């Protein structure tokens, strides 16, 4: 189980990313449309004045049940060992263990 503080920090980053998503996207569109370099620098300064944790690259995918940051399956939102336990307990519909 991950520390609660790390899970809350990640949730805070997700909220910030949602809050500044439209602003960040509009500034990036402006940068691509404007040909002059001086105007691009001004808009780039506005982009850098946004909070650091509002950038989508700062987000990290975590397991829903344990908060584990590694070995996550996107389809389920679970880490590998929790996914294995749930499949063995038949808690995930349609998921079967492979055997050959």
Swiss-Prot record:
GO terms for cellular component: chloroplast; small ribosomal subunit. One of its GO terms (biological process) is translation. It is found in: Plastid, Chloroplast. GO terms for molecular function: rRNA binding; structural constituent of ribosome. Keywords: Chloroplast, Plastid, Ribonucleoprotein, Ribosomal protein, RNA-binding, rRNA-binding. PROSITE patterns: RIBOSOMAL_S14. It holds the Pfam family Ribosomal_S14. InterPro entries: Ribosomal_uS14 (IPR001209), Ribosomal_uS14_bac/plastid (IPR023036), Ribosomal_uS14_CS (IPR018271). Belongs to the universal ribosomal protein uS14 family. Binds 16S rRNA, required for the assembly of 30S particles. HAMAP family: Ribosomal_uS14_1. PANTHER family: 30S RIBOSOMAL PROTEIN S14, SMALL RIBOSOMAL SUBUNIT PROTEIN US14M. Part of the 30S ribosomal subunit. This is Small ribosomal subunit protein uS14c.
């Amino acid at each position: 189980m991950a520390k609660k503080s790390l899970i809350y920090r990640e949730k805070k980053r997700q909220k910030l990313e949602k809050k500044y998503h439209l602003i960040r996207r509009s500034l990036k569109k402006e940068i691509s449309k404007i040909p002059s370099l001086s105007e691009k620098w001004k808009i780039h300064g506005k982009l850098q004045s946004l909070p650091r944790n509002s950038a989508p690259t700062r987000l990290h995918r975590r397991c829903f049940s344990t908060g584990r940051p590694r070995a996550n399956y996107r389809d389920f939102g679970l880490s590998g060992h929790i996914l294995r336990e749930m499949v063995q307990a038949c808690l995930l519909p349609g998921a079967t263990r492979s055997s050959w």
